[in-house]
Amino acid sequence: MSQGFNHFDENGNAVMVDVSGKNVTYRTAVATGEIHVGEAIMEAVKEGSVKKGDVLGVARVAGIMGVKRTSELIPMCHPLPIQKCSVDYELDETNGIIRAFCTVKTEGKTGVEMEALTGVQVTLLTIYDTVSYTHLRAHETLS
């Protein structure tokens, strides 16, 4: 039944992939996403006048926390020692877009792509949560 899907055994049961025979290597993943907040929210974020506080600072911490919790959220994701995690931003003020970049590094037998994707998504969700009361037109895009 596996037919190339390595998260299922021959009987179709979900399994965690066996990485025990793989070599330990350096792993890096970068995920990016964006949230369209518009000019008014962008200005409030830059000025620090959002009622809920430091939007980007809180979202950065939330993203890092999301990275550390990835294996608890994604069923077949291996728990990994995270050796570096950062969340950075690019503000496109003209178009009212906040871009988030989550970089994750480890030394292990499997990659950290899911951790980077989870981190950027939690970052964007936190931004949405902190500004949505102001303007419900904010929406996000993940890539």
Language-model features: locations:
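Short, surface-exposed charged micro-motifs
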Residues: 4-5, 86-90
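A glycine- and small/hydrophobic-rich beta-loop-beta segment
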Residues: 17, 21, 25-27, 37, ...
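C-terminal active-site-capping segments
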Residues: 129
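Generic secondary-structure signature for well-ordered alpha-helical cores
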Residues: 13, 71-75, 103, 132, ...
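N-terminal presequence-like segments and the immediate start of the first folded domain
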Residues: 1-27
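Single conserved hydrophobic/aromatic residue that forms the stacking wall/gate
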Residues: 135-143
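Compact, glycine-rich, soluble single-domain proteins
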Residues: 47-88, 105-107, 112-125
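Acidic-glycine-rich active-site phosphate/pyrophosphate-binding loop
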Residues: 29-44, 89-105
